[in-house]
């Protein structure tokens, strides 16, 4: 049976890893990805609505995203929202679809993106270490109160450290994959 303290730590660390993976997925790289539009909202009948709820978004060719709205009346709204975003892309509206052409990024841009990815992963590592610190503090308190024998406390501390090392290693792997994706020509 898994100790509830270990289970709690694992769940929190897993959520942190998932959050970091999600942030990295939304990051702009040299390749077009529908995920980069997830944060862009369009004012649709007074309600801020994500673009992916108003249109089909697909990758066409190597460097182009195609946004095909289900309601043609939102084409100009989607175009305005993309222009107002910090994506740095110029939407091409042909009356039926919007095309986003991704220019080949410079080496300098790629290095900037790698640096940003590294910062995101570092935030994840800090969050995981904070989870470890909080759980170890809880174990120490339980030991002082006599809820956990000293041997069990040491065993739990070792398990928490192994878990921490495992999740930090996973974050490093996620970063390396993202770095390769960014630096790929």
From Swiss-Prot:
Coiled coil: none
Cellular localization per UniProt: Cytoplasm
Main subcellular location of this protein, as a coarse class: cytoplasm
GO terms under biological process: translational termination
Swiss-Prot/TrEMBL keywords: Cytoplasm, Protein biosynthesis
InterPro entries per the UniProt record, alphabetical: Ribosome_recyc_fac (IPR002661), Ribosome_recyc_fac_dom (IPR023584), RRF_sf (IPR036191)
Domain of life: Bacteria
Entries under Pfam families matching the protein: RRF
GO-annotated cellular components: cytoplasm
Gene Ontology molecular-function annotations: ribosomal large subunit binding
NCBIfam families for the chain: frr
PANTHER family: MITOCHONDRIAL RIBOSOME RECYCLING FACTOR PSEUDO 1, RIBOSOME RECYCLING FACTOR
Entry-linked HAMAP family: RRF
Family of this protein: Belongs to the RRF family.
Function text: Responsible for the release of ribosomes from messenger RNA at the termination of protein biosynthesis. May increase the efficiency of translation by recycling ribosomes from one round of translation to another.
Identification of the protein by name: Ribosome-recycling factor
Native source species: Thermotoga petrophila (strain ATCC BAA-488 / DSM 13995 / JCM 10881 / RKU-1)
Organism ancestry: Bacteria, Thermotogati, Thermotogota, Thermotogae, Thermotogales
């Amino acid at each position: 049976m898994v100790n509830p303290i270990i289970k709690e730590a694992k769940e929190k660390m897993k959520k942190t890893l998932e959050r970091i993976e999600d942030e990295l997925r939304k990051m702009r790289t040299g390749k077009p990805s529908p995920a980069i539009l997830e944060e862009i909202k369009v004012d649709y009948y007074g309600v801020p609505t994500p673009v992916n709820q108003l249109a089909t978004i697909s990758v066409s060719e190597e460097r182009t995203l195609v946004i095909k709205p289900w309601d043609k009346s939102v084409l100009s709204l989607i175009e305005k929202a993309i222009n107002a975003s910090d994506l740095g892309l110029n939407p091409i509206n042909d009356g039926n679809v919007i095309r986003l052409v991704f220019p080949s990024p410079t080496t300098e841009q790629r290095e900037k993106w790698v640096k940003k990815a590294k910062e995101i992963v570092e935030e994840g590592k800090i969050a995981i270490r904070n989870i470890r610190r909080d759980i170890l503090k809880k174990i120490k308190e339980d030991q002082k109160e006599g809820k956990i024998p000293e041997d069990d406390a040491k065993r739990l501390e070792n398990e928490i450290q192994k878990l921490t090392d495992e999740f930090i290693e996973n974050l490093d792997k996620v970063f390396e994959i993202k770095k390769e994706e960014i630096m790929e020509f």
